[in-house]
Design a protein with these regions (language model features):
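Extended ligand-binding regions for polar small-molecule ligands
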Residues: 22-24, 28-34, 81-90, 148-150, ...
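Ligand-binding clefts/hinges and TM-proximal coupling segments of bilobed small-molecule sensing domains
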Residues: 26-34, 41-44, 174-191, 228-230, ...
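Extracytoplasmic small-molecule ligand-binding "clamshell" domains
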Residues: 28-121
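Bilobed "Venus flytrap"/periplasmic-binding protein-like clamshell domains
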Residues: 54, 58-61, 74-89, 121, ...
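Periplasmic-binding protein-like
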Residues: 58, 139-146, 213, 217-258, ...
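Short helix-initiation/N-cap motifs at beta->coil->alpha
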Residues: 79, 96-108, 152, 189-203, ...
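Acidic, polar ligand-binding/catalytic clefts
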Residues: 89, 94-159
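A ligand-binding cleft/hinge motif common to bilobed small-molecule-binding domains
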Residues: 103-104, 121-130, 177-181, 202-203, ...
Length: 295
């Protein structure tokens, strides 16, 4: 009997410890959302002390790309990059940007090798399994793009779904999901860079492609033969910051900073500046091993 009572008491103690831990964690999680930025800053932990490590895919103007100066020297630019610096500055950190292919950014966040990622992410439920989402900082749209010579073939979304069409989209993107949804019978060609999609469109290898509206408009400004023929409905339009999963303090801080950037007009200025730069000389893709524009 004594053994049974002792075991019962031990079980109750263990349950109370776990319940207490759960309550404490829940309280801490809840507390983050009620804290000010100044209260959060000392609680924010990053992979490298003093740095905010951000992954991005610089092939998506005006979000992220390389602006070229008169000597052809590339500078990482775009409103995602500007927002990244704004967030780092607000946290008292130095921004470290690591360029890579789009799907690589998701892998790095999933493996917790980056603090944040910005690459025109939409809040897709599948991605939420491997990263946390910030509040929406920019709302855009989705478009179906083709060349002028083929524009008359696409007057409605249903026109895209033909077996003899080759339809492009970026690997791992919302646009790839939309392509499969609206053109299941077509040959969906997923490419790692939007620049490759544009090149394939212009060369006639693709009949059309799903591209986010703002970057598509930037490409069309440089290549008049491109035509944004259709708006593509998507229920979760908007861009978010991807954040290292379970870093609740960083998530809460980023949300506060995004709210500040939207309120003080900084975000609108970042978008305006990026669109102006994107209309000039630029390179979209990864630089070579010497940090120069790849041939």
């Amino acid at each position: 009997m004594k053994k049974m009572i002792a075991l019962a008491l031990a079980a109750l103690m263990i349950m109370s410890v776990f319940a207490g831990c759960g309550s404490k964690e829940a309280a801490e999680e809840k507390d983050y959302s009620s804290m000010t930025l100044e209260e959060l800053k000392p609680l924010v932990k990053t992979l490298n002390e003093g740095k905010l490590t951000m992954v991005t895919s610089p092939d998506f103007a005006p979000y992220e790309f390389y602006a070229l100066n008169e000597n052809g020297e590339p500078t990482l630019s775009g409103f995602d990059i500007a927002l990244g610096h704004y967030i780092a500055d607000a946290l008292g950190l130095t921004l470290e940007v690591i360029p890579m292919d789009f799907d690589g950014t998701i892998t790095e966040l999933a493996n917790k090798k980056a603090d944040i990622g910005m690459a025109g992410y939409s809040p897709d439920p599948a991605r939420e399994k491997v990263m946390s989402f910030s509040a929406v900082y920019y709302t855009g749209g989705q478009s179906f793009v083709t060349v002028n010579d083929k524009a008359s073939q696409f007057t409605a979304l249903g026109d895209i779904n033909k077996a003899d069409y080759q339809i492009g989209a970026q690997i791992g993107s919302i646009q790839a999901k939309l392509a499969k949804e609206h053109a299941p019978d077509a040959d969906i060609v997923e490419l790692s860079k939007v620049t490759d999609i544009i090149a394939e469109l212009l060369s006639g290898k693709l009949d059309g492609a799903f591209i986010e509206t703002v970057p598509a408009q930037a490409y069309a400004a440089n290549y008049p033969e491109l035509n944004l023929v259709l708006d593509v409905p998507y229920e979760a339009e908007g861009s978010v910051v991807g954040i290292n999963k379970d870093n609740a303090a960083l998530l809460a801080a980023v949300n506060l900073i995004i709210g500040q950037a939207l309120e003080d007009g900084s975000m609108a200025q970042f978008v305006a500046d990026a669109n102006e730069l994107a209309a000039g000389d630029k390179f979209e893709g990864l630089l070579d091993e010497n940090g120069q524009v790849a041939e």
